[in-house]
Amino acid sequence: MAGVLKKTTGLVGLAVCSTPHERLSILYTKILDVLAEIPKNAAYRKYTEQITNEKLAMVKAEPDVKKLEDQLQGGQLEEVILQAEHELSLARKMRDWKPWEPLVEEPPADQWKWPI
């Protein structure tokens, strides 16, 4: 890529990324590294890993920024980068929260019954 393709994203507070492919590759790889620490049978890992691998393959296969934006369907690449940063943050939290483990205590019998 020969320099920045655009001067602004047109979105307040969202700066243009000069190396979006590199940034996305790094973020998606970090997400996959965190997911590897979560049990394979956890639903969050299974589905997030599948989506992240698909997106990483698109980033590696498509050098054209505009075509990649169209394939990822997440807006401008700067927006996709922001989404990937949020997913990485969530993956780290999920790893720490361990939602796949059993509850500490049993929930009340009518917890989800409505109306009571």
Swiss-Prot record:
Top-level taxon in the UniProt lineage: Eukaryota
Pfam family, one: ETC_C1_NDUFA5
Keywords linked to the UniProt accession: Acetylation, Electron transport, Membrane, Mitochondrion, Mitochondrion inner membrane, Phosphoprotein, Respiratory chain, Transport
N6-succinyllysine: residues carrying this PTM: K98
Record carries keyword Protease: no
GO cellular component: mitochondrial inner membrane; respiratory chain complex I
Bridged cysteine pairs (disulfide): none
Topology with respect to the bilayer: Peripheral membrane protein
Annotated positions of the Phosphoserine modification: S89
Subcellular location field: Mitochondrion inner membrane
Positions carrying N6-acetyllysine: K30, K46, K60, K98
Residues the record lists as N-acetylalanine modifications: A2
UniProt main location, coarse: mitochondrion
An example Gene Ontology biological process: respiratory electron transport chain
Family designation: Belongs to the complex I NDUFA5 subunit family.
Subunit architecture: Complex I is composed of 45 different subunits.
Job of this protein: Accessory subunit of the mitochondrial membrane respiratory chain NADH dehydrogenase (Complex I), that is believed not to be involved in catalysis. Complex I functions in the transfer of electrons from NADH to the respiratory chain. The immediate electron acceptor for the enzyme is believed to be ubiquinone.
Entry protein name: NADH dehydrogenase [ubiquinone] 1 alpha subcomplex subunit 5
